[in-house]
């Protein structure tokens, strides 16, 4: 039994609140257990300088945490005057993952910014950010589609992320909270599409190694969790938008 009473193959309780903010074209509050992230999508009718005139769009992301999202206060990065390496890595990961399921040609010459702001952290902030940012992004694109329908809906597939790991006494587990993540012998983040394709695997042994059998178990757990997360995404977005993503 895990520290929070879950089975090894169970996600934390997932709650998604759509339209959480009034101004962005798309927004959600996603809660994964005690981890809570506000994800918002903003549409700009311009692209980065290196893409101007190509007729293609772009997806970019920024990630941040409230100073007291963790058990001790962190100094705001804006006060430090620079973004940390961890933050840069995470926001690049979010943008890269989302671009994997978007037809940038179909999007047209516009940028969609995803802002992922962690208001409470208990492990899995980057995976929750990706899962929530996907919903916010699709909401924004769906609003564009309602105003002037796309000849081809830009979102090609669903996308979600989760964590898996190996605990010293608990074996392989799905969706680690902070206590588990801190003590895990192996920690892995998995990003997958709705059709079962991998977008990214980030796996590391923490002063430990893992076998091919354990790797297979971790991937199987991740696939199960992501399948459940994508069903939640579909419920949140509704049948009409889900059908557009499927090309129906």
Swiss-Prot record:
Q: Does the keyword Nucleotidyltransferase apply?
A: yes
Q: Which reaction does it catalyse?
A: tRNA(n+1) + phosphate = tRNA(n) + a ribonucleoside 5'-diphosphate
- Chain residues that bind phosphate: 86, 124-126
Gene Ontology MF term list: 3'-5'-RNA exonuclease activity; RNA binding; tRNA binding; tRNA nucleotidyltransferase activity
InterPro entries for this protein? ExoRNase_PH_dom1, ExoRNase_PH_dom2, ExoRNase_PH_dom2_sf, PNPase/RNase_PH_dom_sf, Ribosomal_Su5_D2-typ_SF, RNase_PH, RNase_PH_bac-type, RNase_PH_CS
Q: Which domain of life is it from?
A: Bacteria
* Coiled coil residues, start to end: none
Q: Which UniProt keywords apply?
A: Nucleotidyltransferase, RNA-binding, rRNA processing, Transferase, tRNA processing, tRNA-binding
Q: Name one GO biological process term.
A: tRNA processing
**Ranges annotated as spanning the membrane:** none
Give the EC number(s) listed in the UniProt record.
Answer: 2.7.7.56
Name the PANTHER family on file: EXOSOME COMPLEX COMPONENT (PTHR11953), EXOSOME COMPLEX COMPONENT RRP41 (PTHR11953:SF0)
Q: How does it assemble?
A: Homohexameric ring arranged as a trimer of dimers.
Enumerate the NCBIfam families for this protein: RNasePH
- So what does this one do? Phosphorolytic 3'-5' exoribonuclease that plays an important role in tRNA 3'-end maturation. Removes nucleotide residues following the 3'-CCA terminus of tRNAs; can also add nucleotides to the ends of RNA molecules by using nucleoside diphosphates as substrates, but this may not be physiologically important. Probably plays a role in initiation of 16S rRNA degradation (leading to ribosome degradation) during starvation.
Q: Family assignment?
A: Belongs to the RNase PH family.
Quote the protein name from its UniProt record: Ribonuclease PH
| Species the sequence originates in | Listeria monocytogenes serovar 1/2a (strain ATCC BAA-679 / EGD-e)
């Amino acid at each position: 039994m895990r520290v929070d009473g879950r089975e090894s193959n169970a996600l934390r309780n997932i709650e998604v609140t759509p339209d959480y903010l009034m101004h962005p074209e798309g927004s959600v509050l996603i809660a994964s257990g005690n981890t809570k992230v506000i994800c918002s999508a903003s549409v700009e009718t311009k692209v980065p300088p290196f893409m101007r005139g190509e007729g293609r769009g772009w997806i970019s992301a920024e990630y941040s945490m409230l100073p007291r999202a963790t058990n001790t206060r962190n100094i705001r990065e804006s006060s430090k005057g620079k973004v940390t390496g961890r933050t840069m890595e995470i926001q690049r990961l979010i943008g890269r993952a989302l671009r994997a399921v978007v037809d940038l040609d179909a999007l047209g010459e516009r940028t969609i910014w995803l802002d992922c702001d962690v208001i409470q952290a208990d492990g899995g902030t980057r995976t929750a950010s990706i899962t929530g940012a996907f919903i916010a992004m699709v909401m924004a694109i769906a609003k564009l589609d309602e105003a002037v329908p796309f000849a081809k809906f830009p979102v090609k597939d669903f996308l979600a992320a989760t964590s898996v790991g190996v605990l010293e006494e608990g074996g392989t587990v799905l969706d680690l909270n902070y206590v588990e993540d801190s003590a895990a012998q192996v920690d892995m983040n998995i990003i997958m599409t709705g059709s079962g394709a991998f977008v990214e695997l980030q796996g590391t042994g923490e002063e430990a190694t893992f076998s091919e059998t354990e790797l297979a178990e971790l991937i199987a757990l991740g696939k199960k969790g992501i399948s459940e997360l994508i069903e939640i995404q579909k419920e949140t977005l509704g049948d009409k938008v889900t059908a557009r993503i499927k090309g129906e």
